[in-house]
Amino acid sequence: MGGNEKVDLITTQSDLTVLQEKGFILEKMIGEGSYAKVYKATHMVDETRHAVLACKVIDTAMAPRDYLTKFLPRELDVLIRINHPHIVNVSNIFQRRAKYFIFLRFAENGDLLDFLTQNGAVPENQCRLWMRQILSGIHYLHSMDIAHRDMKCENILITSNYNVKVTDFGFARNVVSRGQQILSETYCGSLSYAAPEVLKGMPYLPKLADMWSIGIILYTMLNKALPFNETSVKKLYEKQVMRKWRFRTSVVNQLSTECKQQVTQLIEPDANSRPSAGSLLTAPWIAMEPKLTKMTFLEDSLLKQAIEEVKRKELDREEESEVERIAELRRQGRGKGTQCIQNLDKSISK
């Protein structure tokens, strides 16, 4: 960045100087929202090596309170925990005064919406590969009991070698607490990708809502169009539950039966009837390319780590609950009840 470009609502000269001391140089702005901007950035690893990154700058002084108390802490927690080849990974997070600087992998070929706009509908074989990569990333997230809650074409990035990565975890959250599924009550995401249960305004299971949104992404890739084109929430909901959508005539005869079935299973108004991301990784449509049904070594090892992390957290919660129960018994224990508590302690220590 040069001249007046260095100073705007988000970044100041002081911010840029501090970042440069850490080896990070912000270049041109490539996206912006109400209280966040995204820049292309360079990380000078050493005198001979540098990496091109994206930097999301969040100005908390401009953000609403509910974002600061709920969404931002969740996003940071998720970003720190996740690591998967088809999810945009974070390289560094810095906080300076009221601002967060989040450095992520840069997507050389932009997002999926840009790709569709420039290149048209995606051939089925390419869709199969990209959808398999998206499902792999979401299966990993869901296995960690994390829901994305804002799946859309703009949040699928395309790398230099034309692989895809899921990005933007501003609405992501943990969806299990003490072994129980947490229903979401917040309207999240974009209208065109929102599941009917989200539009209805009732508590919903966010993992299942993610799967609906993935169905919309798949349809959009194949058709270069959305299945529902309504700006009215009421009319959109009615079309969703009545299944009023169809493939475009220009592509319908080019698609395999398995592909069309896959879309239909995902754009399913009954949330409980939608398939999971994990089950779709070996579904008939993906299996038309047999090698895609096999996880890579990295995918498999990271998934196992994610599952083990969830198990460890559950054990920690169980132990914490038991300690809390004993403490409560101690508080309540009087007279003859005290002996029972002491015996209980001994039985636990055996």
Residue ranges, per PLM feature:
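Conserved short submotifs of the Hanks-type protein kinase catalytic core
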Residues: R97-D111, F115
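Activation-segment/catalytic-loop signature of the eukaryotic protein kinase fold
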Residues: I93
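Glycine-rich ATP phosphate-binding loop
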Residues: K37-A61
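Terminal C-lobe "cap" of eukaryotic-type protein kinase domains
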Residues: E268-S273, A277-T293
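Activation segment
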Residues: F171-R173
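Protein kinase glycine-rich loop
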Residues: E27-S34, V38
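Activation segment signature within eukaryotic-like protein kinase domains
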Residues: W130-M131
